[in-house]
Amino acid sequence: MANHNSSRHTIILLQNSPSRATRTFMDYDSIGQAMDGICGLYERKLKEINPSLRNISYDIADLYNFIDGLADLSALVYDHSISAYLPYDRQWIKQKAFHHLKRIANGGR
């Protein structure tokens, strides 16, 4: 069977603060795109805090702190073999974000 890892529809469930009104979701065509989206959220926050900076750089620990600071974060990833979405927690998201950023840093996408 073909490897569907790159084309696994991914839904990110996100809650910024303890208020239930901050619950939202984002959907992506792949896990990699979802990780780009999460990194993008953090990068936008950094730009809001530091509007005069042209280039934003950060350490993986900073991204982990951002992820841990969210009231809730989880992912639903489509599994073609069972035709259903499987849930994943923030630890899984942190692991995937790390591998995604490492791949980008090494020049591969």
From Swiss-Prot:
Cross-referenced SUPFAM superfamilies: ERH-like
Keywords, alphabetical: Cell cycle
Keyword rRNA processing appears in the UniProt entry: no
Source superkingdom: Eukaryota
Database matches in Gene3D superfamilies: Enhancer of rudimentary
Entries under InterPro entries matching the protein: EHR_sf (IPR035912), ERH (IPR000781)
Function recorded in the entry: May have a role in the cell cycle.
Complex and partners: Homodimer.
Similarity-based family: Belongs to the E(R) family.
Protein name as catalogued: Enhancer of rudimentary homolog
